[in-house]
Amino acid sequence: MAFLTVFTPAYNRAHTLPRTYESLCQQDCKDFIWLIVDDGSTDETADLVKGWQKEKNGFEIQYIYKENGGMHTAYNTAYANIDTELSVNVDSDDYLTDTAIEDILSFWKKNKRENIGAIYALDQYEDGNVVGTPFPNDLKEFKGWGYKNIVYYSGGKKKVFRNSGDKKLIGVTAVINKYPPIPVFEGEKYHSLYYKQHLLERDYTVLIMNKPVCVVEYMNDGSSKNMFYQYVRNPKGFCNERRYVMKYAPSFKLKIEACIHYVAESLLAKDYYFIGHSTNRLFTLISVVPGVLLYFIIKRKTKK
């Protein structure tokens, strides 16, 4: 059996998937499976994949079609069908570096031990620049609250690394599947993909592989405005994520930010008993006024 599954959720991405496929074909190490989860595509994705499955490319290609439900539901489907030791997501418009599979395998063989839940590696843009901030050289592993705010010890000193930019999670599949699927709310097609990672980082050690393994496309698409629309369309999913953050975040600032968003998104979901449903009622009560203000800002920004 292969040691790694590369899984790719896809929705009408027949025009970008060939680049992902070519990057997999170029790998010297073919000890992996490529799993495409088709999230209800209406383009030529299925025919494209069927053609690739017939080619002598050196690795197994698995294909699952499902009704459109959003990226998080595609993740749930992927994890339910992965049985390799490690798994990594590569989006349908991204592709692997030339030595990614070999680099991951080599790193895992060298550093594998009990109580490891995942590896974080780097993403890079097509121009070679790393996405966000590279990890410090003295940061080898961590356990606790998320890769955005990592507390670690080096040289006998306590240090804090405040990360910017996405990082590539390479999960230990058996650990990831100990946690429940990402919640799905009726009528909503978005939930933070970080759901399982939050739980994993709390319970297991995460290794740091300070090297790019995936090339991502820079999207200058007005994402902040788009996020306002996501709040309106998927308020229950956002509320669910905020409940976790307000309970477990290590700082007052992070908890208050989560509570402010929770208030606004609860109002968008027409949940007027949000204080009773909160996992941090005191902080939520403190956040009511700014949360209501944020609610009106979101409504104004998304007014047609």
Feature locations, PLM:
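Short, well-formed alpha-helical segments that are part of the catalytic scaffolds
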Residues: N12-Q26
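A conserved acidic beta->alpha catalytic loop
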Residues: S23, D38-L48, D91
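Short beta-strand/loop segment that forms part of the nucleotide-sugar
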Residues: D31-G40, Q62-E67
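Glycine-rich, basic loop-to-helix element that forms the pyrophosphate-binding segment
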Residues: K66-I82
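Short aromatic/hydrophobic "clamp" motif used to bind/position activated sugar donors
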Residues: S87
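Conserved donor NDP-sugar-binding/catalytic core segment of glycosyltransferases
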Residues: T99-F135
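Conserved nucleotide-sugar donor-binding catalytic segment
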Residues: N129-K225
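C-terminal subregions of glycosyltransferases and related glycan-biosynthesis enzymes
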Residues: L207-K304
